């Protein structure tokens, strides 16, 4: 019998050897070494957490939060380190999405005979 958890753990190790993972890791190191970029990232992360908490609790976003969000987004668009990090993140998550689709295809295939034709 196959131990799927061993395979998952191996896949996690393999993920760290991919170009996409290494590129993101390098991009994050570059970001950490730029105090201005790191500060912007931390402000962006904190604001995203506030927005998520408000959404999860059904609270509307205040005008101040909306303005801060717009301001930070503009700063991010003008920050090379953050733009690079986001691009590298997207590439990594695209690869993970592709792998997830391949892994879950057999589940979808189980339902093929049930679908209306």
Swiss-Prot record:
Matches recorded under Gene3D superfamilies: YheA/YmcA-like
Transmembrane spans: none
Cross-referenced Pfam families: Com_YlbF (PF06133)
Signal peptide: none
Domain of life: Bacteria
Family: Belongs to the UPF0342 family.
HAMAP family referenced in this protein's UniProt entry, alphabetically: UPF0342
Name recorded for this polypeptide: UPF0342 protein LGAS_1451
Native source species: Lactobacillus gasseri (strain ATCC 33323 / DSM 20243 / BCRC 14619 / CIP 102991 / JCM 1131 / KCTC 3163 / NCIMB 11718 / NCTC 13722 / AM63)
């Amino acid at each position: 019998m196959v131990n799927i958890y061993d395979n998952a753990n191996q896949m996690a190790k393999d993920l760290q050897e991919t170009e996409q993972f290494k590129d993101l890791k390098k991009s994050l190191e570059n970001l950490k070494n730029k105090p201005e970029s790191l500060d912007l990232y931390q402000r962006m992360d904190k604001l995203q957490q506030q927005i998520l908490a408000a959404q999860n609790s059904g609270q509307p976003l205040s005008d101040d939060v909306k303005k801060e969000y717009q301001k930070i987004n503009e700063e991010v668009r003008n920050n090379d380190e953050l733009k690079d990090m986001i691009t590298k993140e997207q590439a990594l998550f695209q690869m993970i999405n592709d792998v997830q689709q391949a892994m879950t295809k057999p589940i979808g295939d189980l339902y093929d005979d049930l679908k209306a034709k």
